[in-house]
Amino acid sequence: MDNAYTYDAVSNVLSVVNGASVPQSGKAGGQMAHTYTYDALYRLVSATGTYTGADNKTANYTLAMGYDNMHRITSKRQILTQNNVQFNGTLNAGYDLTYTYGTDAGKRFQLANVKDVNYHTEETPSESENVNNNHAYE
């Protein structure tokens, strides 16, 4: 591994880059790069990553986080695209999470519900599948 890191003024990681060379055909490994952004309160708001491997293998992801004025996580969305990694072709996958919290006194930081929507497509969007689950907490 040949990782290089960059940091902001409060030591949050801004990027990680693996400068390894792309391996020969049929070999594992490859180059990776990740970037991170933070808001004025140093909370993670987004991340991106890329991977390049042998035999035209590529992958990338994006992550987005949302917060409310009480600093609670309200949303998380991650999207992944990969080509020729698990099979010859393209895979798109991701999820959207929405968090809600209690409203009664003493329960404003208690997680009340997580709604998640998961999806994936292989080759064409017509093969996508949406799953919607509501997880409730007492």
Task: Please name every model-derived segment.
Residues 1-138:
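Acidic/glycine-rich beta-solenoid
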